[in-house]
């Protein structure tokens, strides 16, 4: 099976079922008659920009990250406001704390923008490490992000 065909099936499965793990995705693919290794699924997830996000019931599930027609920078700033609980800077890194299950989503938005201030991101459940080329650039990024974080308690 071609990669594009497999990825089309993955997209369909993720939109139809609340899949939360690679194992669940592999089981659904197998039920569709598609055999794929965990490494292949992992590559597909990365290439397709699939992220874990909470659904309407608060359960974590895979979703395909897609930008809308909205200005991507505006989407970043809105997401910073909505999901970031705090941000700290250490040398050339910014550590962003988010609401649970939002780390990967925000990191995907940051990565998708290809900002020159960002050398790379490392995301977890509710924390993102954003690496910048140097301390000065990291400070500028910190100030930009911090200005869009909600200070409501």
Swiss-Prot record:
<dbReference type="GO" id="GO:0003677">
    <property type="term" value="F:DNA binding"/>
</dbReference>
<keyword id="KW-0805">Transcription regulation</keyword>
<comment type="function">
    <text>Regulates the transcription of the arc operon, involved in arginine catabolism.</text>
</comment>
<dbReference type="GO" id="GO:0051259">
    <property type="term" value="P:protein complex oligomerization"/>
</dbReference>
<dbReference type="InterPro" id="IPR020900">
    <property type="entry name" value="Arg_repress_DNA-bd"/>
</dbReference>
<keyword id="KW-0238">DNA-binding</keyword>
<dbReference type="Pfam" id="PF02863">
    <property type="entry name" value="Arg_repressor_C"/>
</dbReference>
<dbReference type="GO" id="GO:0003700">
    <property type="term" value="F:DNA-binding transcription factor activity"/>
</dbReference>
<comment type="pathway">
    <text>Amino-acid degradation; L-arginine degradation via ADI pathway.</text>
</comment>
<comment type="similarity">
    <text>Belongs to the ArgR family.</text>
</comment>
<dbReference type="InterPro" id="IPR036251">
    <property type="entry name" value="Arg_repress_C_sf"/>
</dbReference>
<keyword id="KW-0804">Transcription</keyword>
<dbReference type="InterPro" id="IPR036390">
    <property type="entry name" value="WH_DNA-bd_sf"/>
</dbReference>
<protein>
    <recommendedName>
        <fullName>Arginine regulator</fullName>
    </recommendedName>
</protein>
<keyword id="KW-0963">Cytoplasm</keyword>
<keyword id="KW-0056">Arginine metabolism</keyword>
<dbReference type="GO" id="GO:0034618">
    <property type="term" value="F:arginine binding"/>
</dbReference>
<dbReference type="Pfam" id="PF01316">
    <property type="entry name" value="Arg_repressor"/>
</dbReference>
<dbReference type="GO" id="GO:1900079">
    <property type="term" value="P:regulation of arginine biosynthetic process"/>
</dbReference>
<dbReference type="GO" id="GO:0005737">
    <property type="term" value="C:cytoplasm"/>
</dbReference>
<dbReference type="InterPro" id="IPR020899">
    <property type="entry name" value="Arg_repress_C"/>
</dbReference>
<dbReference type="InterPro" id="IPR036388">
    <property type="entry name" value="WH-like_DNA-bd_sf"/>
</dbReference>
<dbReference type="GO" id="GO:0019547">
    <property type="term" value="P:arginine catabolic process to ornithine"/>
</dbReference>
<dbReference type="InterPro" id="IPR001669">
    <property type="entry name" value="Arg_repress"/>
</dbReference>
């Amino acid at each position: 099976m071609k990669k594009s065909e497999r990825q089309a099936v993955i997209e369909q499965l993720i939109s139809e079922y609340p899949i939360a793990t690679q194992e669940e995705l592999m089981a659904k693919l197998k039920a569709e008659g598609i055999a794929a290794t965990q490494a292949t699924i992992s590559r597909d997830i990365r290439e397709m920009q699939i992220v874990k996000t909470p659904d309407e019931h608060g359960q974590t599930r895979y979703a395909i990250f897609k930008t809308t027609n909205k200005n991507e920078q505006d989407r970043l700033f809105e997401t910073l406001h909505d999901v970031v609980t705090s941000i700290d800077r250490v040398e050339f890194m910014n550590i962003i704390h988010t609401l649970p299950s939002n780390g990967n989503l925000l990191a995907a938005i940051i990565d998708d923008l290809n900002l020159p201030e960002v050398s790379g991101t490392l995301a977890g459940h509710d924390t993102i490490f954003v690496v910048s080329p140097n301390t000065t650039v990291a400070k500028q990024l910190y100030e930009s992000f911090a200005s869009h974080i909600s200070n409501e308690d």
